[in-house]
A protein has these predicted regions:
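Short, small/polar-rich loop/turn modules that mediate ligand/substrate recognition or access, typified
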Residues: 90, 176, 181, 238-240
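Active-site helix of classical SDR
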Residues: 124, 160, 168
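Substrate-binding pocket helix/loop in short-chain dehydrogenase/reductase
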Residues: 72, 100-101, 105-113, 208
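Short C-terminal tail/terminal secondary-structure segment
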Residues: 2, 149, 228, 239-252
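Alpha-helical segment proximal to the catalytic Tyr-Lys
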Residues: 129, 173-177, 236
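Residue(s) in the substrate-gating loop at a strand-loop-helix junction
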Residues: 144
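Conserved glycine-rich cofactor-binding loop
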Residues: 10, 17-19
Length: 252
């Protein structure tokens, strides 16, 4: 990205240390935004911060557990104090569990919902206080095409991402009069650490790719243009939408 669509703006990206979160942070920085980077791993965040700074933008590293209310509050406070405000929130932190329901312990279910749903709620609530007060802002929630599919062994993940889609729609209506747009991006299979084990199994990967008309997984960088669109002025009259980017898998 070389345009300055987001010049003068500040973004928070959760789960920013790798995969789609890293791609989002670099895309927003490439479009001119300063970026607060949040995730559990400080080492990963420091590497991404260096890449953001190489693009000429400021980066703020804030190790954060998005399921912890106080930690999320600190993330927002440090962003406002360190970078001067908040204009964009990207809720990307997420986990997956591939356990059939009858074998899945409640703790496994809770782990998925705590990160994917509670984490999205906490960050949106904390950042939203600033966005609503200033009368402008963007929230981009990372959902999944699994929100629209029944996938055996993924009840918790599918349900959690469907919750993110419903939350997106609700907050878009609630905050529309405050000029805050809330949209979601629903990737399909994208080559990240979340599916590294799957990709290491040639037979399992081949089975997955047969369900994708494009016959391949996406790359994190292919999500970047959508991040900039949903975080920038091109989406000023777009809210409550979930954009599916999955190589045609949901269209089948």
């Amino acid at each position: 990205m070389t345009d300055q669509t987001l010049s003068g703006r500040t973004a928070i990206v959760t789960g920013a240390g790798r995969g789609i979160g890293r791609a989002a942070a670099l895309a927003l920085a490439g479009a001119g935004a300063d970026v607060a980077l949040a995730a559990r791993s400080e080492d990963q965040l420091e590497r991404v911060a260096g890449e953001v700074e190489d693009l000429g933008r400021r980066a703020l590293v804030v190790p954060t557990d998005v399921t912890d209310r106080d930690a999320v509050a600190r993330l927002v406070t440090r962003t406002v104090e360190g970078l001067g405000g908040i204009d964009v929130l990207v809720n990307n932190s997420g986990v997956v569990d591939s356990t059939p329901l009858l074998a899945q312990e409640p703790e496994q279910w809770d782990r998925v919902f705590d990160t994917n749903v509670r984490g999205t709620y906490l960050a949106t609530r904390a950042a939203g206080e600033h966005l609503v007060a200033q009368g402008s802002g963007k929230v981009v929630n990372i959902a999944s095409n699994f929100a629209f599919k029944g996938v055996p062994g993924h009840a918790a993940y599918c349900a959690s991402k469907a919750a993110v889609v419903a939350f997106t729609r609700t907050m878009s209506v609630e905050w529309a009069r405050h000029n805050v747009q809330v949209n979601a991006l629903a990737p399909g299979y994208v080559a990240t650490d979340l599916n590294a084990e799957l990709r290491a199994d040639e037979e399992a990967q081949a089975k997955v790719l047969r369900s994708v008309p494009a016959r391949r997984m996406g790359e994190p960088e292919e999500m970047a243009p959508w991040m900039v669109l949903l975080a920038g002025p091109a989406s000023d009259f777009m809210t409550g939408e979930t954009v599916v980017v999955d190589g045609g898998q949901t269209a089948r």
